[in-house]
Amino acid sequence: MKQLIECVPNISEGRDMNIINQVTAEIEKVEGVKLLDVDPGATTNRTVITFVGEPENVCEAAYRVVKKAAELIDMRNHHGDHPRQGATDVCPLIPISNITMDEVVVYARNLAKRFGEELNIPIYCYEEAASQPKRRNLAYCRTGEYESLSSRLGTEEWKPDFGPNEWNEHVAQTGATQVGARDFLIAINYNLNTTSTRRANAIAFDVREKGRPMREGGKVTGKPMKDENGNPIMIPGTLKSTKAIGWFIEEYGIAQVSMNITNINVSPVHVCFDEVCAKAAARGVRVTGCEIVGLIPKKVLIDAGKYYLAKQQRSLGVSEDEIMKIAIKSMGLDDLKPFNPKEKVIEFLIEDMTQKKLVDMTCTGFANETASESPAPGGGSISAYMGALGAALATMVANLSSHKPGWDERWEEFSKVAEKGQVLKDQLLDLVDEDTNAFNKIMAALQMPKKTDADKAARMEALELASQYATKVPFKTMNVAFEAFDIVEAMAKTGNPASVSDAGVGALCCRSAVMGAYLNVKINAAGLKDRAFADKIVADGAKIEAAAIKKEAEILEVVNKIINKE
């Protein structure tokens, strides 16, 4: 599955749309990157830019943004209400899906190094990318802002992580840039069945990490208490990594608790929702729902949906669409207005809507497309689809078993099987289209020019690479389909006996998927120049095929014994 990260550079220009457009145009030149938002502010004289994509592509787009901003923005002439010290003031990278924070930190520091070495801009790394504890704080890195940079540069304390440690004409124009790696920030408002801002604030103070000031006598009217240094003594709230206030919204005619969640791994959205509900209820107030401001990673809804399904002791091994529906209904995300994941979830917004997927067709449409004179989809895609159906059947048996009357205490056992089945099914569905894409790569290579010797050499190299890829894809189908035997076998042996025939058909599908994919491995490997690669993948495939045939026979023996009540 693709790794996705987000980048949110803030440039020090919020008034001149000509400059802003030139900077954002650089992002749109990078293939595989989606520009999500451009938010200029005249008062702050600052523009927040948001784009997303695979890490290497995002880093290239970020480099182009910083380079263009350095060319067009002169910090010597900049004035605005927001703290800043560079043409690109901050450039954080944020993990979205299938990537760890540690991996993002590596990308951030490599990007910072490139800014410093190639663009000669002083770079300070902050938050998770910081090289020293005090630099984790962005405010510290910007101490004194641009106006103090000339006196700070050249000192050991303010030596940049990358780039020049000196004040010169170039740095006077560009200023310094802060590069960070941070968690995704979510803005969420909880709708209350009250118009009281005071009640909303009380709930906000109950939950936000900062909490509320400690007062003499423990009364609201008591004098705020201070420590020996004169600082307010705070009673911490219950939710780490959160900030919150209460307010009244004229548009809706209700009060809300408005919250920023700065680390969804520490305080997931669903945990925050339940805690706000609990604190509100303790004050006689009810949370009727909530609204998410801006975009969110799909993980937020998936984690929430699974959390609420688990509370119901229902199987978690259902489709992502169903899981997200549970999340939306559980947290009342559609309380004030419709909530459409296609418009709010980052992963959906960056999907290539121009490319039609085979798996999005109807059964009839897919069969008709296969039967047409077009050579794709062919046996490789069909094999992957058979494997997906095999995994789906095992998942169905697991879900039926999970909810079987009298088996309530076993719901979690079957839920784990169903979850694994959903993962395998989705992997195989991806391979349906990937197999056809691999075939198309071969066709594209065959259509390359061959007029000159250089053309012919490039064409042959491209054809070899495409053919190798077209061999690897069905080989992956073999592996994933074979892995599905684990859940098929488990459901044949321990699942609902009334559905054992479904497990048997699942075994037939998985065996056919492995054998069909192996035929594609062999035919694509036959023409490869790299015989060592070809011979190895064919030999490895033969072992998987033999094991699949054996496993199918074992499962069918179990299935037939149960059907025949032997």
Positions of the model-derived regions?
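Amphipathic alpha-helical interface segments
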Residues: F184-I186, A438-L508, S512, N524
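Non-transmembrane, amphipathic alpha-helical segments
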Residues: T50, E54, T195, L358, ...
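A structural-propensity feature for long, helix-poor, extended segments
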Residues: H403-P449, I544-A553
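Preference for long, well-ordered alpha-helical segments
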Residues: L111, I121-C125, K134-L138, A484-I487, ...
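Conserved phosphate/anionic-ligand binding catalytic regions in large, soluble enzymes, centered on
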Residues: P9, G80, Q85-P92, N263, ...
